[in-house]
Every structure is written in C-alpha cells, then in structure tokens.
C-alpha cells in the first residue's frame, strides 16, 4: 500500500513518553519521472503533522515543486485528514479535488496527493497495532 520494498520503519513521536504522532515512510511509483519518496507525519488524531518529499526525479521547474526547497505547496497538507477534506476530495483541483496542481504539471501533485491519502488510510487501519507494537518496543528499551 505504501510502496515500500521492505517493511519500512514507522517511528513514533512522543511528548513526555506519550505517543503523539507517527512518522511513516511512503513511496509512490506514480510520479511523472518515477518514484517519489516521502515521509508523512500523522498525528494520533489522524491529521497530517507534516509531509516532506525526500527523493524524486521530477522535472526541474515543474514537478519538483513538491520539494519544500522549491515551493511551499507541500505545507498545504498540514492539518488535513481523511475527514477534512472528505476522501473523495483527496485529488487535485483539476479533478474536482481540494489540492492545487502546478501549471504544466498535474501528474506529480496528483501522485503525491493520492499517496498521502493512502498513508492516512494505512495509519487509520493499523493505528492500534502500530501503537501496541511500538509501545512494546519502546518499553523494552526503557
């Protein structure tokens, strides 16, 4: 679902030993020029804490605007969840969705939007299991 070759490492962010967010690696193969790797921070209420693209081969000046160093577009996901907007709005505006695409580049932002939605779905489906497994591992280290 998340496009990872291996299980990928999900990390839990804690505040005063209480879990507050998960940091989830996610890769979409649907970029214009290939895979787009990102990390998605998900608050335990299911909202996006933050997203960063960590690797891509998108066209300079067009699709590379998914990278925070090129554009602040990626910050538009902060605070969003599968309830805000509704799941059918997790698309680019060109396809009646909530999120902007770039002039001359729709494929790249569409791929990122869809992958973030998949990551939120994964988190919501596996939240309790992730929390239990990671809390158990954390307790063994303490």
Each PLM stretch: what is its role?
Residues 1-142:
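Flexible, solvent-exposed loop/hinge segments and secondary-structure transition points
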